[in-house]
């Protein structure tokens, strides 16, 4: 059965976290991303759905974000200044839109507040997802369905932090519309800095090439691959 972490447990967690960050840097990783979403530990501290503590880590918004800020600061302290720090967040528990759920939950407004705080803690990119911590979550899926959350956050933080979106982004044109705030599927006029794509790469490992062709963008492809799709680069056209 899950149990409430003691203050000693939290202290040990932070020590282990720092060790993990050091290992990641030593291993040569280019980016560190803190996973603060989908019902994992830090998300559970943020959300009043799961955080029922009565000490300095529970209750108020400021207390519930305390561990996240401590982890961010510990991580940034170990990282070279040139190394990007990302943070993935569940921007909404998707409970405020379920009339059958009567309690408090983590909302987009909370995420906007947290993002505004994190701009002064060295987070370079906010990777915006949602949900994952309660069976009564009422997700409304569809193309780019989480993008409005990211755009609300970007509108608040402006140029102080990069903001990306994820979820059911399935074409280059859709991604371009989301980023520019223009065209079908843009999900609002606010521009974004990044779309984060995962499952589409499982379907098509050559996704970058496919989307580039869809958008009419020239990219460099290994010669031995391009030979099979129109000839060697630089060869005279017949």
What are these regions (language model features)?
Residues 1-238:
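Flavin-dependent oxidoreductase catalytic cores
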């Amino acid at each position: 059965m899950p149990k409430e972490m003691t203050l000693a447990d939290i202290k040990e967690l932070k020590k282990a976290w720092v060790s993990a960050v050091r290992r990641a840097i030593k291993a040569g990783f280019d980016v560190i991303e803190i996973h603060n979403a989908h019902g994992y530990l830090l998300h559970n501290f943020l959300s009043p759905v799961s955080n029922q503590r009565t000490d300095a880590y529970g209750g108020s918004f400021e207390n519930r974000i305390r561990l996240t800020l401590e982890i961010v600061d510990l991580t940034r302290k170990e990282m070279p200044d040139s190394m990007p720090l990302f943070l993935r967040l569940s921007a909404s528990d998707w409970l405020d839109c379920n009339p059958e759920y009567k309690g408090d939950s983590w909302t987009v407004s909370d995420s906007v507040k947290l993002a505004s705080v994190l701009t002064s803690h060295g987070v370079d990119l906010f990777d915006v997802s949602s949900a994952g911590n309660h069976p009564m979550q009422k997700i409304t899926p569809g193309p780019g369905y989480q993008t409005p959350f990211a755009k609300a956050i970007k509108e608040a933080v402006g140029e102080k932090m990069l903001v990306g979106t994820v979820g059911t982004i399935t074409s280059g044109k859709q991604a371009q519309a989301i980023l520019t705030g223009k065209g079908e599927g843009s999900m609002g006029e606010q521009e974004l800095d990044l779309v984060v794509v995962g499952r589409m790469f499982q379907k098509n490992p050559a996704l970058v090439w496919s989307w580039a062709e869809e958008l009419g963008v020239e990219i460099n492809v290994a010669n031995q691959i391009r030979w099979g799709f129109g000839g060697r680069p630089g060869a005279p056209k017949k």
